A protein has these predicted regions:
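Residues at secondary-structure transition points
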Residues: 32, 36, 40-42, 159, ...
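Extended aliphatic helical segments
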Residues: 38-39, 61, 87, 110, ...
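Helix/loop segments that flank and initiate small ligand/metal-binding modules
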Residues: 11-16, 27, 163-198
Length: 198
């Protein structure tokens, strides 16, 4: 079962009951665009899993943020046999949360990410996958590391021995097209008020 949580009542504090926390982020500085993710198990960085993904200069910050969530879903799908228990995916992008919660998805990237999240939640060992909002630059270690990975991915700097630098970006699609629609996806939990784009 997957769910989306657009408003975290704890102001972005990590959920301690979920053993797996995956933090994602996107970055764009001039023509440098990237996404990043880091994986934690019970509060500790898991096996050096820090990934940065290089995107094309024409990609936007919302695309990079959504691409980070897509890579988190792919990571869960690829590692289902090793991952037991609930997984929280944290993003500081309310735009991504709103786009993924929209029933009428117009962006190919958002649609692919949504499908992958559903597939990740239907895995062998994963009980639930929840995409949650976390406040940016508020001192959360995982969020700060994901931000660093996104910036390093944008510049194609090697992150760690396990790092991934992706040179083929998603198709240029706009996440904004999926934001602001009134309909919600059936079976997906959301909370919170409408938000503006990041």
């Amino acid at each position: 079962m997957s769910s989306l949580d657009c408003k975290n009542p704890n102001h972005g504090k990590p959920i301690k009951n979920d053993p797996w926390h995956i933090y994602t982020d996107g970055s764009k500085q001039g023509d440098l665009c990237g996404a990043g993710l880091v994986v934690y198990l019970r509060g500790k960085l898991w096996q050096g899993e820090c990934h940065g993904y290089h995107l094309q200069p024409e990609n936007s910050v919302p695309q990079a943020e959504c691409y980070g969530a897509k890579q988190a879903a792919l990571f869960i799908t690829k590692n289902q046999r090793r991952m037991h228990g609930a997984v929280s995916i944290f993003t500081d992008s309310q735009t991504t949360l709103m786009a993924l919660n929209n029933y009428y998805i117009k962006s190919e990237l958002v649609s692919e990410t949504s499908d992958l999240l559903d597939r990740a939640a239907g895995g062998i060992n994963t009980t639930t996958v929840t995409l949650r909002w976390i406040k940016a630059h508020a001192g959360h270690e995982g969020n700060e590391k994901a931000d660093e990975c996104a910036k390093l991915g944008a510049t194609r700097v090697q992150l760690t021995k396990n790092a991934t630098i992706l040179c083929s970006p998603p198709n240029r699609q706009t996440v904004y097209a999926a934001v602001g629609q009134a309909c919600e996806r059936p079976g997906v939990r959301t909370s919170g008020s409408p938000v503006s784009a990041d």
